[in-house]
Amino acid sequence: MGVDSGLPDFRGDQGFWKAYPMYARLGLSFADAANPQHFEHDPAFGWGFYGHRTNLYRETVPHEGFHILQQWISRNAAEFFIITSNVDGQFQKAGFSDDRILEVHGSIHHLQCIKPCCHDIWPNHEEIDVDLASMRARSIPLCPYCNNISRPNILMFGDWSWLPERTNSQESAFQTFMERNSSSRIAVIEIGAGTAIPTIRATSERIGRNHAKVAVIRINPREFQIQPPHISIPCGALEGLQQIDRYLGNMSGK
């Protein structure tokens, strides 16, 4: 979803290295860079990657596709819930209510203690200056409770210290939403969900299997295949949403 806003595509080493050539020179993949051990052994290096991403996400303006989704919701007075594996906070930035979003891998805009010393999760208001040549942070955010290193509240690779409480609360809200709408007709619009980390694809397919009145629409430029009667649209997020919007406009005679 974020690629059409100008955010990098981390799928595959080449896409990651195009966005972060420093890691290509070091021979580090996305999984290598997104390893929580960096915060323990070399926090300036760990925060170099996540500090740069924090700054990038703060500066990024959500694309028109977010507005199209909002228009559909408003026009139809529709109930909705967003499930995302993105950690960039773009849905909140586009104006979607935080209590209607499930961030399955957490959010870069929230922090926790590296140990962790407690179960608190707090907003990330840190200003993180990063040396782009070395991808090392010039300052290290600290835990306000124990003065140890803090880290993003994101589920990383090989991560045993991530605090899931915030995501668990969102998951509970999503389950309540599904129970409330168990007999309703539901459209699941899955956008840009890959197979390497299939969390979102598995969720939409499970909903499509388990609920009789569900249509799943998969928008994906590469991995777009889906079993009938569900629908695939082989293109990027913005183009796919625009296609659906034009179709709905034609159906309504607008």
Please report, for each region that a protein language model flagged, where it lies by residue.
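Conserved catalytic alpha/beta core of Sir2/sirtuin-type deacylases, generalized to analogous enzyme cores
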Residues: 1-254
